[in-house]
Amino acid sequence: MPTVCLLPLLFFTIGGCLGSSRPFRTFVVTDTTLTHLAVHRVTGEVFVGAVNRVFKLAPNLTELRAHVTGPIEDNARCYPPPSMRVCSHRLVPVDNVNKLLLIDYAARRLVACGSIWQGICQFLRLDDLFKLGEPHHRKEHYLSGAQEPDSMAGVIVEQVQGPSKLFVGTAVDGKSEYFPTLSSRKLIDDEDSGDMFSLVYQDEFVSSQIKIPSDTLSLYPAFDIYYIYGFVSASFVYFLTLQLDTQQTLLDTAGEKFFTSKIVRMCAGDSEFYSYVEFPIGCSWRGVEYRLVQSAHLAKPGLLLAQALGVPADEDVLFTIFSQGQKNRANPPRQTILCLFTLSSINAHIRRRIQSCYRGEGTLALPWLLNKELPCINTPLQINGNFCGLVLNQPLGGLHVIEGLPLLADSTDGMASVAAYTYHQHSVVFIGTRSGNLKKVRVDGSQDAQLYETVSVVQGSPILRDLLFSPDHRHIYLLSEKQVSQLPVETCEQYLSCAACLGSGDPHCGWCVLQHRCCREGACPGASAPHGFAEELSKCIQVRVRPNNVSVTSSGVQLTVAMRNVPDLSVGVSCSFEEVTESEAILLPSGELRCPSPSLQELQTLTRGHGATHTVRLQLLSMETGVRFAGVDFVFYNCSALQSCMSCVGSPYPCHWCKYRHVCTSHPHECSFQEGRVHSPEGCPEILPQGDLLIPVGVMQPLTLRAKNLPQPQSGQKNYECVVRVQGRQHRVPAVRFNSSSVQCQNASYFYEGDEFGDTELDFSVVWDGDFPIDKPPSFRALLYKCWAQRPSCGLCLKADPRFNCGWCISEHRCQLRAHCPAPKSNWMHPSQKGARCSHPRITQIHPLTGPKEGGTRVTIVGENLGLTSREVGLRVAGVRCNSIPTEYVSAERIVCEMEESLVPSPPPGPAELCVGDCSADFRTQSQQLYSFVTPTFDRVSPSRGPASGGTRLTISGISLDAGSRVTVIIRDGECQFVRRDAEAIVCISPVSTLGPSQSPITLAIDHANISNTGVIYTYTQDPTVTHLEPTWSIINGSTSITVSGTHLLTVQEPRVRAKYRGIETTNTCQVINDTAMLCKAPGIFLGHPQPRAQGEHPDEFGFLLDHVQAARSLNRSSFTYYPDPSFEPLGPSGVLDVKPGSHVVLKGKNLIPAAAGSSRLNYTVLIGGQPCALTVSDTQLLCDSPSQTGRQPVMVLVGGLEFWLGTLHITADRALTLPAMVGLAAGGGLLLLAITVVLVAYKRKTQDADRTLKRLQLQMDNLESRVALECKEAFAELQTDINELTNHMDGVQIPFLDYRTYAVRVLFPGIEAHPVLKELDTPPNVEKALRLFGQLLHSRAFLLTFIHTLEAQSSFSMRDRGTVASLTMVALQSRLDYATGLLKQLLADLIEKNLESKNHPKLLLRRTESVAEKMLTNWFTFLLHKFLKECAGEPLFLLYCAIKQQMEKGPIDAITGEARYSLSEDKLIRQQIDYKTLTLHCVCPESEGSAQVPVKVLNCDSITQAKDKLLDTVYKGIPYSQRPKAEDMDLEWRQGRMARIILQDEDITTKIECDWKRVNSLAHYQVTDGSLVALVPKQVSAYNMANSFTFTRSLSRYESLLRAASSPDSLRSRAPMLTPDQEAGTKLWHLVRNHDHTDHREGDRGSKMVSEIYLTRLLATKGTLQKFVDDLFETVFSTAHRGSALPLAIKYMFDFLDEQADQRQISDPDVRHTWKSNCLPLRFWVNVIKNPQFVFDIHKNSITDACLSVVAQTFMDSCSTSEHRLGKDSPSNKLLYAKDIPNYKSWVERYYRDIAKMASISDQDMDAYLVEQSRLHANDFNVLSALSELYFYVTKYRQEILTSLDRDASCRKHKLRQKLEQIITLVSSSS
């Protein structure tokens, strides 16, 4: 056997449980999978079976030995194995999966059975795992070659004399001729004996084995028996099994499979298996059946459980786990249940069954084994419990299910394994779950199972079936695929109080009283003493103290502590108060303790700063153990902290109020006057409640207050005063105490300034002796008021608060008190007077002034003296009665009334008329304004289109639209949110569309008038989306430009961009350019702190307000960054700078180029004297050329909405030359000759430079030529090597087919995952009835044809509508595919006829989806070719997809452009030389940190997202894409040692910027090395802000060189174009190749490029590598019989139909027939599937894979074409690529069509039978009612046209189809 390196690890793991953090030991493997566990019952050593390994571990999980068992050269088809006979099948290294691990105690050896060589076993010495033997020479040595590790169970039965026996049950994987499913075998002491594993008994008729009959396998090919658990009890051997339920499973192999659990029993001494009996077994809970057995464990019941069950305590019981239902054996439901069986009950069922059979009753009832029903034979025989069978009446099956007792149900974790044992009187059950948890359950009765603890062991990794105890039952061993864990059975120490300990439910735990801890009884030193160890909650110590409170001024108070449930305390106890003070307690004869309270000094320490009370813990400390074992709360109170009498005597403590000293004290003797002491609230001085104290302004009056217990001031004490505080001023008024119950403030008047308030509340109190306040009730209020303030009219005066006693002084025209109004008495009016009403009402305003004549307008009338109640006011408006609305009436000021309908045809305008009481002249008025009746109309809505999510600001134009008081705008069923209106327009915000994109009518409701206009329609369109921003940064101030790409942007009326930072939201404007682009100004953010970080700030949210489209409100949080605002220095100290005209001006500043913005620059404008200047920008300065003008010019810089005034430029020109200077200049002309000489010398030098440049270019050309040669050589080498490599990788790939429903929906309704046809329809009964009638109507061919032809005739019936109707029709007819096929044929015939009549070329038929029939044809094939896809064509298509994906990912892929080194598409080919290295990273599995690391190959140039995708692809290989995590939800963590963990990201502070380009981070950028350890961890909330700043700082010393070189160029690659090129203004994002669509690449950039066409050799290399997979797919599709699959009937049937149509129309051109068939099937169905494999499989298709599949699909289309392909040097590369293959493919297509034509025709009857069966299989996959509801939409939309068409059609008239449809329409309408 080969030697394989293994890296097992021993860890201490922290277990996460309910309150527990105790570490437990683990043994972890990284490069194998663990399968089985065995624990030695004496030594406690642990043996672990695994794939290719067996381990021996010490009890503490330290590895002692490892034994290698594989891989082995083998082939599953070799029988006998290759070790015995040369095998014709190819041998490859095969993993040896351990399936059985048993300790043979008698022979001191380990039996380890595996999967290789047809299931041979090894015998290993227990001491060192030395291989004692490996029998593999006889057929008895081959147990089963099945690969499942948990499908085998075995039991060793030791014999008193002779060898032990091995009872073994196993799944046989369909090979029943080789392996028995159950057998009894000899375990010989000599491992090399030929008799080893031989059957215990065998003759020519009978043997110790059970085999699955071949007849059973021929009927049920999937039949097998999976053995879950085996055990011995008394003299019987038992097995729990799972097997196919042949009673419920249909013979059809593709149908649903049902399984049943059975218990098998045999006598241990039965050699002939005559005693074989099996019974169905299961459990039920709340009416739900649980029939999938998962695990079981045999144990003894605890005494309590035994008593509850009524069985002896030594009886065996079986704890069993079942999953719900009978389906999904391999992946059972997580709904599981723990059940209990007693062996006596099971044996009783079996005994009764045997007895009934021996009485001749019934049959043997074992159809899978006997293949027929054999009757029981009546045999007079006494059957007892130990009966072991005869040759007759066997084997025997049970007739009913043995039901267990349900104990515990779980619906989330998925219980998977179980173990149990007895502790004291309790049964304790341990359960492992599929989510990696351990559950602990106490079972004390059949109805008493308590889950008391859950421990997280291996998060997310299932606990396997083997769950075993250590010999002393102190630990339990759990097994998962990568880890063995040793956990203590109890963690009592986690509970810190007696209540928590004894309330936990853990039977192991009790409370050790004097040790004050939770532990086992044996761990408690004083447990044997009375009350030393508590096991019941009621036995916890209870402590009371008398007194339970003491004043802070009292010390040394003797406290008596009474206790219950305490042990002997004679050794001594001390008392302590929060460790501040401790004193020894005196033990009283009564058993109580006596403790002193703390001293005054100690009390100050305890209570300082704690106010009136402070609760501390009085603790009792045992002198025996030195432990504080009990405590009780104790209160110290401080009376002096209470400042009022009521709070003092009302406290729960003995506080006393000293009335004359105004203090609270705990000592009554401290009161200086005996009569001044108060000890109850009744004795407190207090102002009594008497309602509000009302004080009119300016009135001199005394204030008398009722009180009680008012103290009489003593000698030397001051008298009473009233203290009033108003508007910040304090007034003290002398007061007189009449007696103890009355006090009066002396005459005084009170004022407050201003008339803004009619009254104001005063701060009013009564004090004595200067500052002793008398207590007031909480409700006491004093109000100071002015009658005239805010009451200028009679009406306002009379509605004043009656308590103020204000009235209207008629002569003074003023609101006054009665005393202030001159006589006579009638001159003063008060509301209490009978008939009081104000004269001279006046209307100042009415609103609105117009309304509809239908009435309903609420008219608001404002004025004065408008009555005191609404009942006394009468109203008419424009001569029409207006009814007052009492709830909106404001006394004297405002009346709101509702207009009745005007019955006059054209009512004239008129005033509002009002009477108060009667209509006499003094009490009547009318308005100056006139009210008019109008007729509002509207004729236009603008805009007429908007997104379906609503939010569009609509303007509805018309006339008189401001009429009335209320307006409601309804768009179909939704209310448009009102904004404003005027006479010509109403503005409102559109609601969300309930129908999605659609046309909707508009209705206005103005009061009681309803206005509509059928000519005005509002159209809901698709919601706009935002797909890309450029750039993704701004400055703090915002206002920089952002270019936004998206879809449907023109439908947005007022788009805005928004940012939210620290709870503050800001927005800015956007301008839509076209439907896919808009330009926005970035919003600024408010930092809240002075200095932003240089690396930028990320807003909490960043997105767009696109009307009400929610999806755009918040984009990816981390993608937008705000950098610090630029700042500038002034022009010199004085602000003035002197320069010459045209010279450079340097403007210095900071943050001029944002830190991570690359070459995307801020747009600076520098104005000098108002004129812009040319700029050069660097990080710290702007270089500007000064203008030509002179003088003082102001300098201003504009950037991103910021303006900087830097100072003034003083531009001074040189003065004109003087005459001597001019003479000197002329004299210099003599030097001209010298200048000419200089020019000649320069020319010579230039010539030499040109020669040197020529040589340099020649050298570059030579270098380029060598690189081209190397590239071509590499491409050729890759072509030769990649094919085999790719083929090997594809072997064994699992195909993640989508289920039929999902597949069909994706093809029928592309892009709509949750289509209504998948959901139940919630409708009123009438509508449901109508839809069912509509469904019946669809089954009338005349109606359906008329319906479809009518829809197609409508100009507004779009292409999309045609596809939708076709798909909905097929769904609605899913249950009648035979009828749908006939309809489809008729529609196709009509289409052919129409095509020929319109003189179109016949070849154009079925080319596009311009009719319902064409889409129906696609859907028809979709339904009927699903099985062919799954069984035949799906495999090559999936392998092609995988091959393309893997081949693309072998080389670099640009994350921005999507270009790749390997590609079939020229458009997606990298045309540069990219240097890269392959790295192998070791990835920690996301679900389980402790599991084995997975090696993953990546490229050092991969972007981080690409690396994450490759890691996920490898870690979750074989897992459907929808069931695995997504890269965007995970962070990539690079781990260096224990502490250093770095989060890698595509962009962070180290992102490199070079000139105008910002480069995406790659693995090479982070300097990740080969062999590095990485982990995928769930993405954190702030993955960059938190993780990066922390991790990079911590690891700076290691990576400081990386950070310093953050701008150096590095090699980066990508896997797929998954990064959006988020670009800033002027900055381009790049990964591997700079996008040269930009025109601003640097000079010389092209100099580094090779001739791009050279790289087209890569296309050929990639094409050659993938050729096999393309050929396989085409061959499968274009073969009539391939891979054992016959041609689908649908293809032959449809091709024959097309030939019939051609014959009927005398079309003899073979090219036309060929084209019809190509358009019908390959182009309509296969091309769609090839381009969109995600329709068939649960996968993700990236852009490079899509591009390559498009090339394959184009080749497929070209292969089906009859036209000649004329290719030249200018033809597209994808045409040239397959140019030589297409003729061959064309021949395949022609042969395929010929072969189909030669096949026997399918009769309509046979086809109908096939279609009926297909309908039955998928009858319930879709909700037909929902489909009918969707179809009915088109009836509503084109109702009149359809009804008209039904009238015109004779057949429809004959069957009265119009009336039937109208009946349906009526039914629907009646429910709306």
UniProtKB/Swiss-Prot annotation:
Extracellular side: 20-1220
Coiled-coil features, chain-numbered ranges: 1240-1294
Protein name: Plexin-A3
GO MF assignments: semaphorin receptor activity
Cellular location(s): Cell membrane
Residues making up the signal peptide according to the UniProt record: 1-19
Tissue: Detected in embryonic hindbrain, spinal cord, dorsal root ganglion, trigeminal ganglion and superior cervical ganglion. In newborns, detected throughout all layers of the hippocampus.
Record-linked Pfam families: Plexin_cytopl (PF08337), Plexin_RBD (PF20170), PSI (PF01437), PSI_PlexinA-B (PF24479), Sema (PF01403), TIG (PF01833), TIG_2 (PF18020), TIG_plexin (PF17960)
Disulfide bridge map: C78-C87, C113-C121, C267-C388, C283-C339, C357-C376, C492-C509, C498-C540, C501-C518, C512-C524, C575-C595
Cytoplasmic face residues: 1242-1872
Annotated function: Coreceptor for SEMA3A and SEMA3F. Necessary for signaling by class 3 semaphorins and subsequent remodeling of the cytoskeleton. Plays a role in axon guidance in the developing nervous system. Regulates the migration of sympathetic neurons, but not of neural crest precursors. Required for normal dendrite spine morphology in pyramidal neurons. May play a role in regulating semaphorin-mediated programmed cell death in the developing nervous system. Class 3 semaphorins bind to a complex composed of a neuropilin and a plexin.
Entries under InterPro entries matching the protein: Ig-like_fold, Ig_E-set, IPT_dom, Plexin, Plexin_cytoplasmic_RasGAP_dom, Plexin_RBD, Plexin_repeat, PSI
Residues that span the membrane, as ranges: 1221-1241
Residues bearing carbohydrate: N60, N549, N1163
Family statement: Belongs to the plexin family.
IPT/TIG domain mapped to chain residues: 841-934, 936-1021, 1024-1123, 1126-1212
Keywords from the UniProt entry: Cell membrane, Coiled coil, Disulfide bond, Glycoprotein, Membrane, Phosphoprotein, Receptor, Repeat, Signal, Transmembrane, Transmembrane helix
Modified residues (Phosphoserine): S1597
Record-annotated Sema domain positions: 20-489
Membrane-topology descriptor: Single-pass type I membrane protein
Disruption phenotype: No visible phenotype, but causes subtle changes in the central nervous system. Mice exhibit altered apical dendrite spine morphology in pyramidal neurons. Mice exhibit defasciculation of the facial branchiomotor nerve and of the ophthalmic branch of the trigeminus, with variable severity. The number of neurons in the dorsal root ganglion is higher than normal, probably due to reduced neuronal apoptosis. In mice lacking both Plxna3 and Plxna4, migrating neurons do not show the normal response to Sema3A and Sema3F and do not migrate away from these semaphorins (in vitro).
GO cellular component entries: plasma membrane
One GO biological process term: facial nerve structural organization
Organism name: Mus musculus (Mouse)
